[in-house]
Amino acid sequence: MFLALNYSPQAVRLVQSGQIKIDFFKTPDWDWLIRQATAIHPVAVHFTLEAGNGSISQIDWKQVDRLSQLTGTPYINVHLDPRQHHYPEISVDTQSDADVKRVYRVMLTDVMQLVDHFGAEKIIVENSPYRGEPGNTLRLCVEPEIITRLIEETGCGFLLDISHAIISSRYIDMDTYEYFSRLPTHTIREMHFAGIHRLNGQWIDHLSILKADWRWLDWVFMRIHMGEWSQPWLLAFEYGGIGTAFEWRCAPGVIVKQVPMLYQRVCDLNSRLSAV
């Protein structure tokens, strides 16, 4: 398993100065940024594709394939993220069988378009965070049974965003251990992780790692070590980034302190797994 870190100017300076060690920068699928990042360090591209809103058919298939091959990223990810503003006539927290059936059909169709182009073995489906926000992510797409069903029916792999799973479990009022136990963790191909803070009455991720977050990561690593969950190719620390949405959460002090702690955990897990 490798370690990636969100690309940011602060992260670049720390990598170039030798203050932190990572295996990959994680970047969005922006051509200019990938060119900039690959000149400095290996890159794992994270695609901005979404399933559930009927937009997959509009993507540039050649561009997706080109960026995947250019960076050597082994998987093409898609976010399972139908949003209420695409379905204004249903409530964001709907659990109606008719609504679930309707939206699931769109999610399945979107993912299968990717499967038809690239093959199921190449596609990984990421779980989104649900917070019950009007216009935003629908609750039904974070239900573990829905995620599991989609993975099984499409044959795709699972991109487990640990922080998203924790946040979603809190907002749907399900015990977090129970939530994880219902996810298709035997199909994990990649994982994402970041700190979760309570800000303005909401649980927000992509922040510095707190004590409670470390405990969750260690618990996840134990599941992998015990062979209960499959081993991902990559763990991405989703701290920092490009633009105004991230400029307030790119503290060099956080990166220089927490990345080595993550890297050591990844190395320790790799050593334990290779000794089995």
Model-predicted regions and their roles:
Residues 1-68:
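N-terminal pre-domain/capping segments
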Residues 1-7, 20-27, 41-47, 74-78, ...:
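Hydrophobic faces of well-ordered beta-strands that scaffold small-molecule active sites
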Residues 9, 29-31, 49-51, 80-84, ...:
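Active-site-proximal loop/turn and secondary-structure-junction residues that shape catalytic pockets
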Residues 16-21, 36-39, 69-70, 116-118, ...:
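Flexible, charged surface loops at secondary-structure boundaries
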Residues 54-55, 93-104, 168-232, 240-241, ...:
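Gly/Pro-rich active-site loop or hairpin
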Residues 58-157, 167, 254:
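Active-site acidic/histidine proton-transfer and metal-coordination neighborhood
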Residues 134-137, 162-163, 169-172, 203:
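A short secondary-structure junction signal
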Residues 246-276:
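C-terminal helical cap(s) of enzyme catalytic domains, especially alpha/beta-barrels
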